[in-house]
């Protein structure tokens, strides 16, 4: 098959061309002439031959007649085999290649047409030899087809044209048939019988039936004269299954009735009517020949049914050979000349033969793919071209922009130069004016000097005083200038220090009472790290200098200095003492090195407000938390125009610093006194360790700090010791160095450090604190917990309305149950860390900040709880503190009425802690939760049970289909039958292809038979049946492939997988089960096949040897025949010479005596006798040759049969080789098969149900 893609030598794909059918090649009709010998009847009428042969291509009537030239001329001696080899064999070869072919025998009555086409039993004509040659050619093509992809279908039909009516020679009941024309298939006869033949015997049987039905009658010129035109049509369909291509070729073998004259044939009645119709159709044939020869615009094919049938053979798509049969008798001279003239005209006709091959879908797909590749390639080339052009355009645009910029710059430079030139001109003018002014001033100065010198003696005292005043003024001006420059330098230096120094962000907490609003304000004080004392000294120096200036300078200078100072003092930002006292700043430190750490601990968990005392334009957080570089507690940076400080400012700052130090000392003294009290109390207590919880000090998520709880019990005192690790201040410097406004407002502060129990934040990593708390006898004193901010945990109402047993409950998750079980009978009471607000605020801020922020990851809550999860925290303060607490309680109760919602705390464990106030019992899971869990588990189990049932049903159905489906070969035979019916040549087409083929076949049948004919409905029903069966088989194969694909782990994907050989073999093996039962039988059968193949191969060798021997004998015989023919020709020449001599002698005999005539007659008789003997010898040799030819044909047929048997045996052996090795029979499989056989009817019924379910 021609491929639409052509590759050159370089491997590049050439430009694709649209796949076209083979182009026709113009060729003339081949015309040969055959002259029969004189018949016995003609010899009896003393008729003689008037035909003269010049060579193998020229002939003339009489010696001096015109010559007729043809492609080949056959004389009296040429045999049937020679005619076939020269005329018919090339047509048959082209017919096998896919061309249409036609062989026509034309001539007068009794000229030998039927003998040439049909022959007799002893000497076969062209038709039987053509059939034999076709089968031989098909067998050769099958031998060359190693892939077994070629399929052949040979159909044969016969018709006759009798009295201008078409009859079916095979089925005599079909008469008066109609001629149709198809766009692709050409001319065809509607309703004619087409018989598929598979062997030569079937073809011979068809020919015998057709010849018996032909119209034959006896006339004066022929005892068995054909009274009709007969046409034998042979159609060959060749299908290449691998390439999905097909070729359809037709061969027409035409035996025309002879033209005749009524007075010669003696036709009367019906014979006369037959002769008229014959002559009419032959005359129409002559008109067509003339029209084709002359190149007329219109060819009268429709004048006769004969020319209509032969339309493709004459000037159409066919390779045509015309045999003109002539009679040598002088009685038929006119008819012979007419026949020769007909042949001369016919050989000028040109046909357009071509291979009748259809363009396949595969070729079109390849062509489309090639076009798509070329399109993609051209698209990429266009993209590259456009990309390169765009780059060039972009480069040009960039160059243009650069040029424009250069032009603009050059214009600017020109303008600048022009402006400079103009300024130079103006400067020159100004300079000239100044020079003139100087010259004038010199003149005036000289005049003044002269005037002063003249009055020097008169104004001496005045000049002395004036000089003193001028000196003082100059000194004052110089001093003032120096001070101003120095002050400017110092201001510049301060500005640089402010830009380069770092500012601490001191977080001052507004420690309101516990009953205040939940929003707690923090004030950020930005302080400089500069030295205030040095600045003050510098300011004092400035003041002293200014005072000196005031004493020495005049009043204007003093006024200017005072104005400057007054203007600068307006920018001083000094907070009032009352404002600072309202913030209750408490740093809880012993020294100034831990200020930042103390601020961090106090601010943990509080929400920071956005109000600032002042702001700095340049903040450097890198050193803000550095302990060694910490500034004083309150320091205010100076603005850019900060003037020298006054005494009041110095006094204010000194008082403020002294007050902070005094407060620190008082707090330290208070703390030391508390420590002594605690130590004295712990000596009378007994210590019991409850439990130890190991936690990580670095605060990763989900892990707590290591805390050791120790309960010291006595009669009325409980001492709690809390040991935990603190965090180095240096580790907090980067995380809490400085907070900006946006961070504070969005409440996304960094995690504050853990709650610590230390009162002095030094670099020591572990500290211990113990405190003694007196337990009152009255349980109502538990209300003192409100001082720690736990009033939010309680229910509505004041502390007076609370019940004695109401406690705050911390509800923990399941993770804490195990720890609680170890402490079943112990209630732990946690006391406060410190006396000051620092420790209390830490715990309070933890609860409040978590509650207000809504997130629980910042500060882990450390609490001690009993077995029920109840936390009890008691605190007893001094009377002063209790009075403050009562005020706080009233405000907190008001807040409780507005905010009543459970508080959620987050511990470092995985489960959050919920504080409940309604009961002291641990919450238990609800019944609805348990029911939902059970439902989920039941749903899971139910889905698994359903899946198991479906899997079991699938496996059972697949095993049943395995046992009861028909074998693969049977289904393949059925499938191929249906596919051939629809004209499909692939074994596994898709459903779309099947539907399309059905539609095409039905439309073709409608065109052939008509929409209302019975044949059309029969064909349509058969097409529908084939379509339904094929669709059903496709569904079955798909279902089986899916089942077996899941069983044997093959990848099935519809028709593509089913078409694969591995899938076919797997399905075949699974369904036939040959590998279970047939191990020994297969081996024995395979051995028998091999031995039989060996025997047949030996027989074929012997047969080949016999054939070779016969061929050698045949060659020897033919050589002998050729020698005899040469001798006969020589003797014929001698006879001719002697005949000429006899004629001369006869002419002389008339003048000679009777005695001389007798002698000549005797010589003539002897010569004739010799000729007769030679002719008999020739006939004998020809008979031997025919018998040898028949024997050779028979041997060839035997050889082909043997070869077919060998192929069949090889195929079976190949199937046996492909079959898997037999497995060991399984007794379980035998039991299952016996069980299935017993329950066969039940299983068959279920199989049909399963099959319907699959459908």
From Swiss-Prot:
InterPro entries (alphabetical): Kinesin-like_fam (IPR027640), Kinesin_motor_CS (IPR019821), Kinesin_motor_dom (IPR001752), Kinesin_motor_dom_sf (IPR036961), P-loop_NTPase (IPR027417)
Keyword Transmembrane helix: yes
Molecular function as annotated in GO: ATP binding; ATP hydrolysis activity; microtubule binding; plus-end-directed microtubule motor activity
Protein name in the entry: Kinesin-related protein 7
Compositional bias segments (type: Acidic residues): 813-834
Entry keywords, A to Z: ATP-binding, Coiled coil, Cytoplasm, Cytoskeleton, Membrane, Microtubule, Motor protein, Nucleotide-binding, Nucleus, Transmembrane, Transmembrane helix, Transport
Binding site for ATP: 107-114
Keyword Transport appears in the UniProt entry: yes
Xref: PROSITE patterns: KINESIN_MOTOR_1, KINESIN_MOTOR_2
Membrane-topology annotation of the record: Single-pass membrane protein
Region named Disordered: 1-26, 454-503, 530-564, 579-628, 661-686, 795-864, 915-934
């Amino acid at each position: 098959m021609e491929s639409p893609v052509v590759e050159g030598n370089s491997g590049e794909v050439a430009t694709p061309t649209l796949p076209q059918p083979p182009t026709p090649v113009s060729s003339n009709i081949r015309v040969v002439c055959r002259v029969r010998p004189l018949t016995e009847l003609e010899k009896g009428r003393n008729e003689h031959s008037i035909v003269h042969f010049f060579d193998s291509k020229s002939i003339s009537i009489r010696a001096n007649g015109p010559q007729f030239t043809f492609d080949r001329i056959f004389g009296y001696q040429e045999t049937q085999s020679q005619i076939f080899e020269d005329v018919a064999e090339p047509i048959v070869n082209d017919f096998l290649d896919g061309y249409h072919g036609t062989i026509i025998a034309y001539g007068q009555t009794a000229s030998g047409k039927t003998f040439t086409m049909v022959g007799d039993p002893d000497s076969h004509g062209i038709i039987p030899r053509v059939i034999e040659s076709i089968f031989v050619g098909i067998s050769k093509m099958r031998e060359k087809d190693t892939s077994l992809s070629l399929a052949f279908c040979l159909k044969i039909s016969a018709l006759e044209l009798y009295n201008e009516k078409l009859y079916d020679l095979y089925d005599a009941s079909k008469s008066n048939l109609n001629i149709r024309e198809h766009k692709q298939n050409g001319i065809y006869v509607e309703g004619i019988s087409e018989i598929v033949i598979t062997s030569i015997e079937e073809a011979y049987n068809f020919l015998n039936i057709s010849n018996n039905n032909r119209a034959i009658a006896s006339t004066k010129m022929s005892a068995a004269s054909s009274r009709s035109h007969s046409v034998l049509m042979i159609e060959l369909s060749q299908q290449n299954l691998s390439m999905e291509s097909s070729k359809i070729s037709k061969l027409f073998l035409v035996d025309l009735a002879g033209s005749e004259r009524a007075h010669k044939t003696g036709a009367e009645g019906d014979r006369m009517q037959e002769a008229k119709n014959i002559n009419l159709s032959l005359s129409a044939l002559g008109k067509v020949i003339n029209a084709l020869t002359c190149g007329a615009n219109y060819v009268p094919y429709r004048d006769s049914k004969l020319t209509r049938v032969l339309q493709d053979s004459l000037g159409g798509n066919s390779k045509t050979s015309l045999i003109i049969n002539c009679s040598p008798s002088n009685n038929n001279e006119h008819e012979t000349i007419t026949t020769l003239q007909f042949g001369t005209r016919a050989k000028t006709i040109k046909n357009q033969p071509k291979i009748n091959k259809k363009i396949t879908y595969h070729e079109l797909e390849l062509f489309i793919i090639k076009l798509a590749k070329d399109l993609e390639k051209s698209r990429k080339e266009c993209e590259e071209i456009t990309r390169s052009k765009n780059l060039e355009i972009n480069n040009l645009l960039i160059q243009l922009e650069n040029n424009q910029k250069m032009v603009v710059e050059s214009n600017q430079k020109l303008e600048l130069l022009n402006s400079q030139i103009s300024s130079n001109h103006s400067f020159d003018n100004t300079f000239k004016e100044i020079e003139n002014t100087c010259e004038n001033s010199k003149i005036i100065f000289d005049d003044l000097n002269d005037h002063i010198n003249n009055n020097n003696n008169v104004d001496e005292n005045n000049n002395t005083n004036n000089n003193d005043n001028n000196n003082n003024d100059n000194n004052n001006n110089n001093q003032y200038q120096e001070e101003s420059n120095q002050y400017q330098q110092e201001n510049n230096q301060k500005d640089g220090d402010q830009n380069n120094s770092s500012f601490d962000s001191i977080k001052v907490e507004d420690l309101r009472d516990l009953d205040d609003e939940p929003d707690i304000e923090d004030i950020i004080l930005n302080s400089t790290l500069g030295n205030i004392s040095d600045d003050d000294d510098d300011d004092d120096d400035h003041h002293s200098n200014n005072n000196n200036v005031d004493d020495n300078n005049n009043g204007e200078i003093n006024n200017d200095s005072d104005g400057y100072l007054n203007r600068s003092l307006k920018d001083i930002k000094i907070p009032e003492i009352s404002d600072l006292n309202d913030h209750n700043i408490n740093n809880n430190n012993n020294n100034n090195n831990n200020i930042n750490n103390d601020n961090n601990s106090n601010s943990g968990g509080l929400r920071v407000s956005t109000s600032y005392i002042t702001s700095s334009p340049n903040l450097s957080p890198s050193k803000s938390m550095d302990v060694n570089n910490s500034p004083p507690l309150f320091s205010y940076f100076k603005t850019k125009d900060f003037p020298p400080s006054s005494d009041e400012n110095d006094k204010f700052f000194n008082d403020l610093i002294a007050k902070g130090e005094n407060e620190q000392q008082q707090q330290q003294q208070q703390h030391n006194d508390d420590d002594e009290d605690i130590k004295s109390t712990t000596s009378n207590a007994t210590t019991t360790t409850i439990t130890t919880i190991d936690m990580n000090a670095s605060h990763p998520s989900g892990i707590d700090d290591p805390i050791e709880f120790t309960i010291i019990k006595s009669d009325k005192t409980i001492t709690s010791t809390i040991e935990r690790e603190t965090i180095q201040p240096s580790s907090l410097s980067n995380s809490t160095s400085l907070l900006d406004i946006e961070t504070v407002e969005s409440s996304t502060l960094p995690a504050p450090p853990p709650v610590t129990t230390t009162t002095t934040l030094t670099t020591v990593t572990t500290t211990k604190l113990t405190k003694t708390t007196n337990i009152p006898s009255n349980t109502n004193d538990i209300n003192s917990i409100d001082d720690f901010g736990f009033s939010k945990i309680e229910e509505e109402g004041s502390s007076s309305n609370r019940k004695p047993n109401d406690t705050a409950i911390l509800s923990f998750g399941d993770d804490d149950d195990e720890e609680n079980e170890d402490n079943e009978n112990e209630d732990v009471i946690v006391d406060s860390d410190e006396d000051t607000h620092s420790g209390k605020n830490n715990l309070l801020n933890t609860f409040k900040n978590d509650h207000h922020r809504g997130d629980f990851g910042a500060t882990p809550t450390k609490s001690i709880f009993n077995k029920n999860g109840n936390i009890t925290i008691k605190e007893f303060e001094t009377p002063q503190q209790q009075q403050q607490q009562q005020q706080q309680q009233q405000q907190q109760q008001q807040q409780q009425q507005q905010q009543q919602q459970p508080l959620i705390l987050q511990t470092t464990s995985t489960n959050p802690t919920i504080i409940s106030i309604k009961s002291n019992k641990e919450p238990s899971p609800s019944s609805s939760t348990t029911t939902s869990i059970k439902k989920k588990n039941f749903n899971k189990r139910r889905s698994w049970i359903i899946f198991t049932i479906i899997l079991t049903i699938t496996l059972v159905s697949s095993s049943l289909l395995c046992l009861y489906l028909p074998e693969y070969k049977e289904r393949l035979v059925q499938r191929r039958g249906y596919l051939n019916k629809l004209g499909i040549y692939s074994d596994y087409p898709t459903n779309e292809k099947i539907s399309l083929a059905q539609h095409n076949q039905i439309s073709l049948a409608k065109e052939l038979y008509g929409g209302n004919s019975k044949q059309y409905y029969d064909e349509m029903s058969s097409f529908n049946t084939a379509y339904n069966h094929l669709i059903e088989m496709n569904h079955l194969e798909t279902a089986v492939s899916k089942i077996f694909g899941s069983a044997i782990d093959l990848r099935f994907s519809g028709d593509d997988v089913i078409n694969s050989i591995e899938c076919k073999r797997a399905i075949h093996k699974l369904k036939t089960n040959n590998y279970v039962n047939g191990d020994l039988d297969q081996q024995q059968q395979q051995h028998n096949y091999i031995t039989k193949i060996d025997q047949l191969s030996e027989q074929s060798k012997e047969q080949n040897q016999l054939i070779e021997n016969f061929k050698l004998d045949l060659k020897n015989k033919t050589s002998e025949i050729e020698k005899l023919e040469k001798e006969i020709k020589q003797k014929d020449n001698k006879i001719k010479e002697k005949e000429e001599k006899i004629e001369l002698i006869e002419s002389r005999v008339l003048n000679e005596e009777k005695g001389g005539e007798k002698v000549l007659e005797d010589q003539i008789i002897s010569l004739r006798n010799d000729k007769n003997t030679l002719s008999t010898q020739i006939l004998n040799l020809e008979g031997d040759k025919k018998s040898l030819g028949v024997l050779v044909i028979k041997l060839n047929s035997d050889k082909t049969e043997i070869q077919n048997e060998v192929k069949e045996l090889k195929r079976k052996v190949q199937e046996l080789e492909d079959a898997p090795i037999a497995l060991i029979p399984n007794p379980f499989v035998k039991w299952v098969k016996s069980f299935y056989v017993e329950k066969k009817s039940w299983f068959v019924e279920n199989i049909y149900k399963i099959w319907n379910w699959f459908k």
